[in-house]
Amino acid sequence: MNLVLEAKNIDKHFHKPKDFHVLKNVSFGVKVGEFASIMGKSGSGKSTLLYILSTMDTDYTGELYLNNELITGKTHQELSRIRNKNIGFVFQFHYLLSEFSVLENVMLPAKKLGEKTNTEIIHDAHQKLEMLHIGHLADQRASRISGGEKQRVAIARALINDPTILMGDEPTGNLDSHNSENVFNIFKRLKEEQGLSLLVVTHDEDFAKRTDRIIQMEDGIIVSH
């Protein structure tokens, strides 16, 4: 089985204000080209797990593999590069820089990675925006576009470095049903047309039911996947 991401025996405690065992021996994998969702009540550990899987949180025990490479124990600098190159992330809030144009926002992760010339990055950013049907917004200031458009810009930004996996933490949480449907269809298209792997934390049962697989969490444990 070809896995893009694998977690083995992930364990995590929060130590303040008192000890809380938030993740308990979590093991599962995401296959190449799979669109998986994580569901569970608030406090079940799903967002905490996602932040570990995305390499943003390193305070855990267990092993994490990305593209069959063990990434647990790497330095923050190494992880930053691995994350920027391999993982696209879409949050509930878009985190766009309002004073920048749409195009400039999309370009930022590629500039940080530093593997392409500015001309190549501009070309790639336009391409991602066109793919999401928002190419006409490229020169607009990010503060001037609608909420649904902002989330599509955030997706374009997450895709700029051609990641191997796209992760989402409640990416439709702030959107109405029309824009939520838009985001779902974009994700489905990325899986079907580009073979992208996706892992999305969601409260939206309708969204989750239409993904390839639901990973159900309860009290820090995966109860079904």
Show the residue positions of the predicted features:
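Helix-to-loop junction immediately C-terminal to a conserved catalytic motif
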Residues: 54
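Conserved ABC transporter NBD signature motif
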Residues: 62-70
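A short, proline-enriched helix->beta-strand linker immediately N-terminal to the Walker B motif
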Residues: 160-164
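Conserved ABC ATPase signature
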Residues: 141-149
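Catalytic Walker B motif of ABC-type/P-loop ATPase nucleotide-binding domains
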Residues: 166-169
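The feature captures the beta-strand-to-loop junction immediately N-terminal to the Walker
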Residues: 39-41
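Short coil-to-helix segment of the ABC ATPase nucleotide-binding domain corresponding to the Q-loop/switch region
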Residues: 100-109
